[in-house]
Amino acid sequence: MSDLSLLQCTNLSKRYQDGKLSTDVLRDVSFEMSSGEMMAIVGSSGSGKSTLLHVLGGLDTPTSGEVIFKGQPLSTLSAAAKADLRNRELGFIYQFHHLLPDFTALENVAMPLLIGKVPTSQAQDKAREMLAAVGLEARSHHRSSELSGGERQRVAIARALVNSPSLVLADEPTGNLDQRTADTIFELLGELNVRQGTAFLVVTHDLQLAGRLNRQLEMRDGQLQQELTLMGARQ
């Protein structure tokens, strides 16, 4: 693993067992990602993309293989240590924003900091800063139910970045948005990558979206291809 390596997974496999029936969702996946890199993994639904993100984020355990983050094998960490790592080092963005509906945009964005025991005033100041970065400073006291779909996703991005994570794992982050809003969101991710040096690993079935990132790999039937064949991708 190089000095600039942020994330490495080696011979990663994931098998789900249901009685006598077994399903191999990930099969011998290996790749390395550098600090500050923006990388896309393209694949159709059911190809194993989301499972891979869950394993990389320590939300699921591989059947075999290893995930190494900043030189630390995840297999050596307790559940509490993984949770702490996720809160300090990782950000998550999903197709559906998963905002708390009864909380304001400011409260949603501040939540990871409060979980990390950051003082409330400091957490709110940082949350305001991130909402300003995504162009929503004026909407900070609106509940998520009062925001448009694009605004909610921008709040989710601000929440993912409020802890200044080294890596953001994004699962179809624009899949629920119209093309114009999706374009705006991806311009924002690029700006934050440059401004904060945040690395982004984005899984998507949208080839046009993936083409905006530094590197593209393809997931097909649980295996990672080092070159795109475009099978199952949407152009």
Swiss-Prot record:
Enzyme class, first EC level, given as a word: translocase
Binding-site positions, ATP: 43-50
GO CC terms in record: plasma membrane
Classification via PROSITE patterns: ABC_TRANSPORTER_1 (PS00211), ABC_TRANSPORTER_2 (PS50893), LOLD (PS51244)
Pfam families referenced in this protein's UniProt entry, alphabetically: ABC_tran
Membrane topology classification: Peripheral membrane protein
GO biological process: lipoprotein localization to outer membrane; protein localization to outer membrane
UniProt cross-references to InterPro entries, sorted A to Z: AAA+_ATPase, ABC_transporter-like_ATP-bd, ABC_transporter-like_CS, ABC_transpr_LolD-like, LolD_lipo_ATP-bd, MacB-like_ATP-bd, P-loop_NTPase
Domain ABC transporter, first and last residues per copy: 7-234
UniProt protein name: Lipoprotein-releasing system ATP-binding protein LolD
Organism: Pectobacterium atrosepticum (strain SCRI 1043 / ATCC BAA-672)
Gene: lolD
